[in-house]
């Protein structure tokens, strides 16, 4: 781990390109963006990383009280549970993980919305 701050944010080395607001997970000692609802997200990128080796600040899920902005991967209803790929959780009782609840709606992929975050868990 590269650096820890007092507010639950850490800086980590990116394993590839990451956009601001994307959920990230560990992979080979670095962080990469989550691409599946079953990915074990550790946080949300607070800034983007253009390429592998770049340093990216990450808000660690569940490590502080508050909210964080995510980049939606599709439409999300206000109040919906959000998966690590940035989508609305729609399949109750599956292996999809839930990492937060949308505090505002996203109309389409790419929208930045605020979520109340939590350590990822199943229903």
What are these regions (language model features)?
Residues 1-123:
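Surface-exposed, low-hydrophobicity beta-strand/loop segments enriched in small/polar/acidic residues
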